[in-house]
């Protein structure tokens, strides 16, 4: 439970920081975060070849979702965060799921869903702000 509280708190803190500094492009910031979190799993799994391959594939997929979210449509970013949350949930069904740190899944799910809902809120609140 502590991991989820830390994840929610950190997610809200990041949102607050980038809301204060309005000159940052939100699509780029949240796209960079999405692309980075996919590659964290590759770092966790480097000791197992099959896990590295699986995690590299998911990292590239989330990188592409981030890219298309920045360049084409923010809905790719929103979908990417929710899908990454589902990835966090499903990761325990893979062999060698113990390669990720304890409670990292709860921490990451919390941040993923906070960012996903925040971006969804922004899209529907400021429809013209996120046109490609």
Where would I find each of the regions flagged by the language model?
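Membrane-helix boundary connector in multi-pass membrane proteins
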Residues: 77-79, 89-104
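Cytoplasmic-side transmembrane-helix entry/capping segments in multi-pass membrane proteins
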Residues: 27-36, 54-58, 77-83
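Hydrophobic cores of alpha-helical transmembrane segments in multi-pass inner/ER membrane proteins
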Residues: 10-13, 61-64, 110-122
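Structural signature of hydrophobic alpha-helical transmembrane segments
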Residues: 1-10, 49-57, 106
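Membrane-interface helix caps and helix-loop-helix hairpins in membrane proteins
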Residues: 21-26, 44-52, 95-102
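N-terminal signal-anchor/start-transfer transmembrane helix
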Residues: 6-23
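Hydrophobic, membrane-inserted alpha-helices
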Residues: 12-15, 35-42, 57-65
